[in-house]
Swiss-Prot record:
Belongs to the UPF0761 family. Signal peptide: none annotated. It is found in: Cell inner membrane. One of its GO terms (cellular component) is plasma membrane. Keywords: Cell inner membrane, Cell membrane, Membrane, Transmembrane, Transmembrane helix. It is a multi-pass membrane protein. Pfam families: Virul_fac_BrkB. The chain crosses the membrane at residues 44-64, 104-124, 140-160, 183-203, 210-230, 244-264. It comes from the Bacteria. Its main location: membrane. This is UPF0761 membrane protein YihY.
Amino acid sequence: MLKTVHQKAGRHTRPVRAWLKLLWQRIDEDNMTTLAGNLAYVSLLSLVPLIAVVFALFAAFPMFSDVSIQLRHFIFANFMPATGDVIQRYIEQFVANSNKMTAVGACGLIVTALLLMYAIDSALNTIWRSKRTRPKVYSFAVYWMILTLGPLLAGASLAISSYLLSLRWASDLNTVIDNVLRILPLLLSWISFWLLYSIVPTTRVPNRDALVGAFVAALLFESGKKGFALYITMFPSYQLIYGVLAVIPILFVWVYWTWCIVLLGAEITVTLGEYRKLKQAAEQEEADQP
């Protein structure tokens, strides 16, 4: 009886073990941690230019002036670790200084922000091992669309939420809306990762695989935020060593950890499809044998 149970358990866990082995092999071959380090470096160089461009877009639309403040607080509260308030103050100072730049400097900011998107495109297509390339004009159009429409859609969403909360007839729904807002960061992360894994690769990505990889990445991202905040609170060694400058290594580590999660989600998405193909090929080979 016990032997039968072990045999059945082994049959069920064997595919999982094989998939995990394939996942680990892909992570090692793609040098995922090195890719994450490269993206973290580019991200830190592009962070202020990217935020400056986004806030400049909001400034161009007076209707989003109030929403831009809400969006800033939402991003730093939900997509940064516990030191998000300190990081927010520094970044807002940098952005305020960038507003004094000339037209040539502003173009440089835009180019730097677009370089981050190019680096993301290159890293994900390395993981998917796609040899296809998009036309440069098409790639620029996609990057610019993400850079402009993304923040505007997020701002419109927050504006609609604020409007609904201000309505008297919606007062009974405030509890429901509050509960939805609690899981909103997870949902936004899931949707963002899904779009990233579906649109950026130059090869076809099965929607089911992208959803699974994005969900795992979103869970790890939200768990990582809480774990990172707990580590900073329980083991404040950075503050003891670096003092006022502690925010710098904290931001470095957080950005690197975030890119590790993003690329891990991409590896999961890739290996789900690859494992399915390998399994089908093995079954076909076994069926063809006399």
